[in-house]
Amino acid sequence: MKYSSIFSMLSFFILFACNETAVYGSDENIIFMRYVEKLHLDKYSVKNTVKTETMAIQLAEIYVRYRYGERIAEEEKPYLITELPDSWVVEGAKLPYEVAGGVFIIEINKKNGCVLNFLHSK
């Protein structure tokens, strides 16, 4: 069974790899990715793309700058970070004398870098 699924996968890959009109992001490529994902071939799948605290902070800063602007991203440094089993939670920090207003909170999926939650408290 294992060999037949690997053979099928390789045949599928060769079929589309030899196709000169293949377009990146095409339906065929997406179908192939889903097929490999269903086979649970860990060798070919990406796990924990966001592996480090530093990377999580960099991603959070990109999202915050895009959504709230440069000023908010800089004002709420240094960022506080919490590691959960499947995600990173990054929060902005305010100095004690800056009691008015809230901070951003963003949760980023470790596996793929997607934003799971994103808000700014008041």
UniProtKB/Swiss-Prot annotation:
Top-level taxon of the source organism: Bacteria
Induction annotation: Repressed by H-NS, induced by LeuO. Part of the rhsD-ybbC operon.
Signal peptide span: 1-17
Entry-linked InterPro entries: NTF2_fold_dom (IPR028921)
Keywords in alphabetical order: Signal
Protein name, as recorded: Uncharacterized protein YbbC
Species name: Escherichia coli (strain K12)
The gene coding this protein: ybbC
